[in-house]
Amino acid sequence: MKFQYDEFNPNRFEVHRLALDIIEPNSRVLDIGCATGYFAKQLLTKHCETWGVDRDKSAVKKAAKYCQKVIVSNLDEVTSLPVPKKYFDYIIMLDVLEHLLHPENLLSMIKNNLKDNGKVIVSIPNIAHASIRWLLLTGGFEYADTGILDKTHVKFYTKQSSQNLLNKCGYKILDTVPTNGMCKVPLLYKITDRLPVKWQYFIVKKIPTLFAFQFICVARMTRTRIRPAIKK
């Protein structure tokens, strides 16, 4: 896929900032789907060592400026990545899995590259967001160049199904963080846009399955099989 991002979004309750805040300083990070290195650049401010992976050669050339090493790879076709085993504190995949035909293969493959106490950080668009529900209610479902219905997405996830995917691949969910999607809500956005962002996010956290634009799942490897999440 072509990279969509070449700038870091610093907004407090958006995916880039929320994911960055999770990562501890001086960590070793594998950024899968690194694009132009916009996120790796921010990790430098936290004195992290970042390795980048992306299928777009032109993006990887730009990312090399901020990464210890960069790798060009089609994630749907590889069975391993040329990176050290048990090396990384974090493996991040920001808006990556929904572009893959077999995301479970990647999630299983990278476990060997995490330290024993390492974590994966995955962000996935929320197909159950209010804007998509409204489209379905009114008979629409049009793909777009960006967003939840990005035309390059081949998989769609809810909060529950994204957690189930990670569980099935041998991860234990430590946290699931919603991103602010209030500005995308049909009919309500003219009202919610007037609210302070922290108030918007308060509403999102109260009803995340409806108002979160994405979910950021933080997980750790487990040796025991995790049962799929049950909707409550």
Label every model-predicted segment:
Residues S162-V177:
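A SAM-dependent methyltransferase catalytic signature shared across enzymes that methylate proteins
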Residues L107-K119:
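A short glycine-rich, Lys/Arg-flanked "PGG" loop and its adjoining helix->strand segment in the class I
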Residues V122-A144:
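Conserved class I S-adenosyl-L-methionine
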Residues Y90-L101:
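A short SAM/SAH-binding and catalytic strip from SAM-dependent methyltransferases
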Residues M1-K86, Y90, E104-L107, T138, ...:
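Conserved N-terminal segment of class I S-adenosyl-L-methionine
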Residues A144-S161:
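Acceptor-substrate binding/catalytic loop of class I
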Residues L101-N105, I132:
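Short N-terminal helix/helix-N-cap motif within the alpha/beta-hydrolase-1
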